[in-house]
Amino acid sequence: MKTLLILTILAMAITIGTANIQVDPSGQVQWLQQQLVPQLQQPLSQQPQQTFPQPQQTFPHQPQQQVPQPQQPQQPFLQPQQPFPQQPQQPFPQTQQPQQPFPQQPQQPFPQTQQPQQPFPQQPQQPFPQTQQPQQPFPQLQQPQQPFPQPQQQLPQPQQPQQSFPQQQRPFIQPSLQQQLNPCKNILLQQSKPASLVSSLWSIIWPQSDCQVMRQQCCQQLAQIPQQLQCAAIHSVVHSIIMQQQQQQQQQQGIDIFLPLSQHEQVGQGSLVQGQGIIQPQQPAQLEAIRSLVLQTLPSMCNVYVPPECSIMRAPFASIVAGIGGQ
């Protein structure tokens, strides 16, 4: 009801003010403001409550006294401010109520979770002594340590196949290197100058033009071989030449094939002399001389660097070498 009265008073004041402004728009507006402003301030400080019991009497008689009444709604504006702090203050303590169940609920399950802690120590404690039982087979595993000295007895047995190493090296050397270095083998055999009846056969089989072709092929194949395998390649040429001469020697059976040497080399107490015949080394020194002949021929003919490791002839060739000659 108070708000309705205030609104009606405001409406009347606005209509009266607009009527006064329309009557004298030039000078009455300032005059009304000067008179109404102190009048509006006085009832606020002196008697703001006296106007509440007599709002109806002021409508027809005193329109000027009704003008200060529009400022009365300032008091009700302050009144709604009171419920704002009062209303939210009540729910704030209400929100504190749900805080009680939060500590109450988790406190109960925490002691409940402590119950499964009991089976954890009980269960693993029993299997731990059970796992100690497989420690008994460990000494059983120590029993096979006895056959370890037995294979030591077999260790000298693999030393026996070392004698057959040339047989194992043959399939490795022959398909890979000897096939590539067949021209080198042929040129070394051709450079040896046979005598008597065989000389005519060599001249027919290996003409001089083919000799140059084989020399070029030999140098090309030897240059394509990596430096790490050049030593093995030269040894393979030695091996292939020796095997071929052995086969020829078995086939001819009595035909003397003279393989003269271009140089007179002193090897220990013995010597290799031109026209002496097939070289059949029976000492490591003679075998070393044959190897040196091949090492001097191939690198000088093809201008290929030979590593110093090739100066050592391996033992497996000693049982195979029958003889070799060349320039």
UniProtKB/Swiss-Prot annotation:
Residues 82-91, 100-109, 118-127 have a biased composition (Pro residues). Residues 42-81, 128-169 have a biased composition (Low complexity). It holds the Pfam family Gliadin. Keywords: Repeat, Seed storage protein, Signal, Storage protein. This is Gamma-gliadin. The gamma-gliadins can be divided into 3 homology classes. Sequence divergence between the classes is due to single-base substitutions and to duplications or deletions within or near direct repeats. Gliadin is the major seed storage protein in wheat. InterPro entries: Bifun_inhib/LTP/seed_sf (IPR036312), Bifunc_inhib/LTP/seed_store (IPR016140), Glia_glutenin (IPR001954). It comes from Triticum aestivum. GO terms for molecular function: molecular condensate scaffold activity; nutrient reservoir activity. It comes from the Eukaryota. Residues 42-169 are annotated as: Disordered. Residues 1-19 form the signal peptide. Belongs to the gliadin/glutenin family.
